[in-house]
Amino acid sequence: MTLYSPEFSESEQSKIDAEFSRLTENKSVYLDHAGTTLYAESQVKAAAEQLQRNVICNPHTCRLTGDFVDQVRYKVLEFFNTTSEDYHVIFTANATASLSLVAENFDFGSFGNFHFCQENHTSVLGMRERVSHAKGIYMLTEREITGCSLQNGSSKEKPTDPGRSLVTFSAQCNFSGYKIPLDAIGNIQENGLHTPGKHIWGTEGKTSNNDYYICLDAASFVATNPLDLKRYRPDFVCLSFYKIFGYPTGVGALLVSKRGAEAFRDRKFFGGGTINYAYPHTMEYQLRESFHQRYEDGTLPFLAIVGLLEGFRTLERIVPKTKELATMERISRHVHGLAKYLEDQLKQLKHPNGEPLIQLYNKAGYQDRTRQGGIVAFNVRTDSGDYVGFGEIACVAALHGILLRTGCFCNIGACQYYLGLDGDAMDAIYKRAGRICGDYFDLIDGQPTGAVRVSFGYMTTIHDVEELLKMLRSSYLATKPQQRILFIEEQAGQLPPVLQKRVQNLRPKLLQMAIFPVKSCAAFKIEGYLKSWPLTDQGLKYDREWMIVDMNGMALTQKRCTELCLIRPLIKNDVLELHFGDSCVSVPLSLEDQAADSAKCVSKVCRQPVEGLDCGERVAEWLSTNLGQDGLRLLRQSGQRNSSKDQQKLSLVNQAQFLLVNRSSVRSLQFEEPLDDTVDRFRANIIIDTGLAFEELSFKQLSIGKVQFQVQGPCQRCDMICINQKTGERSPETLTTISRLQSGRMRFGIYITRISKDTGDLQLSCGDTVLVE
């Protein structure tokens, strides 16, 4: 077990706590320092006093303002242990603007390529749209940057092509906190890349004989870690100051090495302050001599830049350096210690059955501070291994006063890597399901589309970590899902508006309906353009109203004829169409039209006699031909049939009006076939997803939309579920798996019956809320 060892002394911690007393006053636990850290009270007070003391105006007007800006420029270089001899400082709006500036101005030459790491911020992906002048664009994995770059001492081909390649990666992943070893910077600059990565755009070709330049996205890293630019010399460094100081916002920087400056091409645009002169009557102009002035278009955000001085001073005052450690080194040790402690505690959270509560996402573990920062990403799982949506976690955390981040954190590539999403899964999430960045669409078929992230700053305390652990234990180890949902719904008014919308989706929904017009044949699914379906006093309209009988009048089922599942029904234009391969036949839906010239017959369903109308010779011949059995007939139920148990009205179903299946229970079977195919095996009318496997077995009553249902009991399964409903092939593992999971009992799904006797115009609709009573 990891014991927490504080980095700060008691007196230092007391001073820090005093700077952030608003957290205690507001009963808030702030755990999103990777989003932004918090500003100290004395910091903003000193910044305001500075504005009150001085006349700070446009730097083109006032020399004092220019001196302040130069002071900050010097302080930035000092903060990163470098000087103006080696780096230029260009002030930008933020790290994103810095990345954009590099993409727009980097000169790739004729054969240069753009390489970026998969686990990068969205802004790096945005660079691809600005580097169309590169020959090709390649995506690198972290391993291809660190493990597969050529080893030191090996020799790269001497550049022969007029090409410069740009490699962009994050010093610290803002999703997981993983740190790419910064030795990769010099290694790639000197030796190039052993493999270019996955080619995704442009011309694919040989790249090893280019000069290589490094663009380091340092926004997440420098917030809590020292970056020594004398030791590591990336060509471009992008950052946002609010990540470090919390205040001010709206100002970032691009640090450009002297080598990097030589790789910038001539600008296609200039703004105020970037030129010595520009003639209006000709195209002649002359850029400033100073490199940074050429790229700082217009008036700088000078008030924000001046405010950075107090950011540097406050940080050094609140977290003073020691004989051995500088300020940022101490902050790095502090946040890593908290993350290491939290990770260890999360690993110990177990459900009563021993299943882990937490799924962690990291690469290197938390033992080595040079490889892992103060970020912990995770998802919560149930005792059956199902995932809890991150939207629910966000709601529960907010109601406990905990501010954290959920989703993909503007890093879809890291999401893809850590969640194991291939291209098809990405399409299912973003194209077919319609998820967008920043929403709370957290689960698709039980699989997470994002994660929960907590991240630490120098003002984070061990108490904050314990509050998070307390919330997870009380909400996910000591309560049932229905209790948790009820708690959230009762307190929903206290949530921010964006989370209030998520509360509306916490309850399970009716995902899909299916009717089986012909008993034992394929389903007609209510989905897509068909969102709703009417109810009758027997169940869903047209469900199991027809059945096929043999020459002896006995009902034909898949137990005797598996090919029945290949007969596909289609209801349209007042007829029931039956399809088998390319062959089709139809019968009228209207019972009056059917009864006009039909003979009455009697058959049996579950030992009960049922009256039916013969549907005629044409459909009989069609069935016999396609199924290869003589004497088959299609009958339609005409007489009333009641349950022997409670006199409920039934169609040709075996036992109850409706059969409900929970997709979470289906997922627990873990078959290799597509989930939808496994769901189809159970031939249910109503498909929901509660997020908890076999939770439906505890239901007594439930409502779907406005319709109330009584649970009749579990469905006892036979070997018919071993039949693949798409192919008709048998596979015994379905039944054996259920038997194993249910301790020898063959139960899967539940029978339900509508409580209200009033039919009216009742209907069920996909998307209806499922409320367990």
Curated annotation (Swiss-Prot):
**Tagged with keyword DNA repair:** no
- Coiled coil located at which positions? none
List UniProt keywords, sorted A-Z: Molybdenum cofactor biosynthesis, Phosphoprotein, Pyridoxal phosphate, Transferase
Q: Which InterPro entries match?
A: Aminotrans_V_dom, MoCF_Sase_C, MoCo_sulfurase, MOCOS_middle, PyrdxlP-dep_Trfase, PyrdxlP-dep_Trfase_major, PyrdxlP-dep_Trfase_small, Pyrv_Knase-like_insert_dom_sf
Which cofactors are reported in the record for this sequence?
pyridoxal 5'-phosphate
Q: Which residues form the active site?
A: C410
Pathway stated in the Swiss-Prot or TrEMBL entry: Cofactor biosynthesis; molybdopterin biosynthesis
List every position bearing Phosphoserine: S731
A Gene Ontology biological process noted in the UniProt record is: molybdopterin cofactor metabolic process
Q: List every position bearing N6-(pyridoxal phosphate)lysine.
A: K243
Domain of life of the source: Eukaryota
**PROSITE patterns per the UniProt record, alphabetical:** MOSC
Role played: Sulfurates the molybdenum cofactor. Sulfation of molybdenum is essential for xanthine dehydrogenase (XDH) and aldehyde oxidase (ADO) enzymes in which molybdenum cofactor is liganded by 1 oxygen and 1 sulfur atom in active form.
- Family assignment from sequence similarity: Belongs to the class-V pyridoxal-phosphate-dependent aminotransferase family. MOCOS subfamily.
Q: What is this protein's name?
A: Molybdenum cofactor sulfurase
Per the UniProt record, the source organism is Drosophila ananassae
